[in-house]
Amino acid sequence: MEIILANPRGFCAGVDRAISIVERALDLFGAPIYVRHEVVHNKFVVDGLKDRGAIFVDELDEVPDDNTVIFSAHGVSKAVRQEAKTRALKVFDATCPLVTKVHMEVSRVSRKDIECILIGHAGHPEVEGTMGQYSSDSAGIYLVESPEDVASLVVKNPEKLYFCSQTTLSVDDTMDVIAALQAKFPLIEGPRKDDICYATQNRQDAVREIADKVDLMLVVGAKNSSNSNRLKELASKMGVTSYLIDTAENIETDWLTGVNKVGVTAGASAPAVLIKQVVEALKSYGGHQVIEHPGKEESIVFAVPAELR
């Protein structure tokens, strides 16, 4: 059985930065350090930070006064920022800079009183943070997930609209929704470059590259990781039996029956150690050759805040 590794895979610059911010805050200020929401969607990473003294909370009212809080890579609403400021909490912002870019787009159209349509998944922390950049007294912001949502969408002024998207969506699905928006609202405007982040795009492209070369695809990533789920969905759409796994322990040996080539990739919040463990497990199940499939090299690095360097 050949093991074909997709490239790129695993950590992206935004995840690296977010984890580094929590680690550096713990190094400099000591435990406890509070983090609003999982800093990234990966249990292994979160548990490791918990062991070092990070405390993960859902809301700021769980953070005691005079403490340090870190906002997760997914970003937060303006209301959350204001609450932290009002309480004089020490804040470090681990929001991915590419998410911040979308926040700035939404804030800009809100100030101009332009209705905004966000393409994204309801309930995802990034979507909640992005929706929360839009002022409640402006024209309005709407969330759509599919062309069907677009078909039933009613806006106040079809001639004055702007769209943007969650950064971790399926590239193909997002293009379908954008096409539906442009067909229904010909004057709608959007970002010069789509909001899907480079890491999401590259990892989906890498799956496309190897999908027709493998009999099975394993995606290392958490069940609540948007970009990991999109990788699994993409491989499945391309006709490959695919599974999303947290760790090597999730591999079921009957998946490998009759499999000659297995592809391995990982979401942007999955650490290299978990990918390595999956490869080692596959070797123990009969994998005799590991092939690194060539892909796009990533050199982007996002700096941590100056106070933490």
Curated annotation (Swiss-Prot):
Residues engaged in binding dimethylallyl diphosphate: H41, H74, H124, S225, S226, N227, S269
Domain of life where this protein originates: Bacteria
Keyword Phosphoprotein: no
Positions contributing to [4Fe-4S] cluster binding: C12, C96, C197
Cofactor(s) for this UniProt protein: [4Fe-4S] cluster
Keywords: 4Fe-4S, Iron, Iron-sulfur, Isoprene biosynthesis, Metal-binding, Oxidoreductase
Enzyme class, first EC level, given as a word: oxidoreductase
Cofactor note: Binds 1 [4Fe-4S] cluster per subunit.
Molecular function as annotated in GO: 4 iron, 4 sulfur cluster binding; 4-hydroxy-3-methylbut-2-enyl diphosphate reductase activity; metal ion binding
Family matches, as InterPro entries: LytB/IspH
Catalytic activity: isopentenyl diphosphate + 2 oxidized [2Fe-2S]-[ferredoxin] + H2O = (2E)-4-hydroxy-3-methylbut-2-enyl diphosphate + 2 reduced [2Fe-2S]-[ferredoxin] + 2 H(+); dimethylallyl diphosphate + 2 oxidized [2Fe-2S]-[ferredoxin] + H2O = (2E)-4-hydroxy-3-methylbut-2-enyl diphosphate + 2 reduced [2Fe-2S]-[ferredoxin] + 2 H(+)
Gene Ontology biological process terms, A to Z: dimethylallyl diphosphate biosynthetic process; isopentenyl diphosphate biosynthetic process, methylerythritol 4-phosphate pathway; terpenoid biosynthetic process
Binding-site residues for isopentenyl diphosphate, renumbered to this chain: H41, H74, H124, S225, S226, N227, S269
Residues the record lists as binding (2E)-4-hydroxy-3-methylbut-2-enyl diphosphate: H41, H74, H124, T167, S225, S226, N227, S269
Active site: E126
Pathway membership: Isoprenoid biosynthesis; dimethylallyl diphosphate biosynthesis; dimethylallyl diphosphate from (2E)-4-hydroxy-3-methylbutenyl diphosphate: step 1/1; Isoprenoid biosynthesis; isopentenyl diphosphate biosynthesis via DXP pathway; isopentenyl diphosphate from 1-deoxy-D-xylulose 5-phosphate: step 6/6
Keyword Metal-binding part of the UniProt annotation: yes
Its EC number(s): 1.17.7.4
Family: Belongs to the IspH family.
Record's function text: Catalyzes the conversion of 1-hydroxy-2-methyl-2-(E)-butenyl 4-diphosphate (HMBPP) into a mixture of isopentenyl diphosphate (IPP) and dimethylallyl diphosphate (DMAPP). Acts in the terminal step of the DOXP/MEP pathway for isoprenoid precursor biosynthesis.
PANTHER family in UniProt: 4-HYDROXY-3-METHYLBUT-2-ENYL DIPHOSPHATE REDUCTASE
Name this polypeptide is given: 4-hydroxy-3-methylbut-2-enyl diphosphate reductase
Organism of this sequence: Colwellia psychrerythraea (strain 34H / ATCC BAA-681)
Protein's gene: ispH
